[in-house]
Amino acid sequence: MTKNHILGLDIAQNSAVTQLDRADGTKCWRGTLPTSQAGWQQLEKILAEHGARLPDTLVLLEATGVYHLPWAERLHQAGAEVYVLNPLLAARLQSAANALREHKTDSVDVHRVCEIGRLYAAELARFRYQPEPARQGLKQLDHARRKLRATLTNLKKSVQSHLELVFPALLKAKIGPCTARASAILEKAPTAGAWRALPEAERQKLAGVKQADLDQACADTLADEALAQACAPAVHALLSAQQALAEQLRRCDAQIAPRLPRERVALITSLPGFGERTAAVMATYLPASFEGWGPRKKIVPRVQALFGLDPRLRQSGKWTGKVKISKRGIGAGRTALFQAAFCSLSHDEEMAAYYALLRTGDGRGRRSKTHKEAMVDVMRKQVRRLVAVLCANQPYGKKSHKAA
């Protein structure tokens, strides 16, 4: 259907700079709307004043964190054809008027968005907005989990750093500072002096096979007892926060599990190297209908690009730059693919042999690759296997997926 108007929105937390153009590029209106019901009602009034109906309007938004989602949902429900553009695309498709000056204002941005819609509407199909509340909720949970995981990792590092001052003997005895054994010891005796003051039987109960090592480390330590006692409350505070965050992470995992597409997760975990966690990430970020993107040979490069594994070419005349992965896609998926590729080297003889071949060269003039280059190739091979398994809807088997 031919659209009569183009509506562009550059959305921030509390406002949306909006421009309405006719299909030929003539500007009808530009202004700022609040991100509220009042802003929506004002938009409806403006559209009516200029004879624009949302079903006959091409709407383009620039993806801005999560701020664009309420607008995209409301516009979609009102019958508009909504496209959510990658900010990098919007930034690089400069308008002719601003290409040399490179001004950066909200008005310039929203004008550029409208111009993209006018010039490239036929090529924007992959940016068409489709409401998927359940999938978006799963993405938000995964994002929350990654934040919790990162915070927990930083807390564990902080605990170890504090123990270097308070109870270095615990680390010297090779007792993991984040283990249940360390927690029990620190609860009863947070310093070397407090440990030596405990009865032999209690020390044996707390440290087990590590008692002798810890006793010796406490005897050899240079830590000042008064200073250690003064700083011990900081260790207890960090340990309490660590335990609370670990429990919160477990609850987050429990919320994610029932929301995952179990059949897809089962297929992905059949691949060597993929576990429950990495399979969950891939199932979360792979579009539900990606199998319909075309033949498998076309799907694979598109999935690679989705996770930023596609090569970024740099050539000009006789000069050839170093080819690197683009890293433009979904970072969480790329991390999961790296973890799966790394694990596959230990659990899949075929993949280990493939990695070894990449590192040594094939003996026919093809150069050997560095570890990083070889790992990227292994990640791409995992993508080929992933696509083969999901498109065939069958668990992985060497005989049935030789093409991967």
Short names for language-model regions:
Residues 1-404:
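A detector of single, family-specific signature residues
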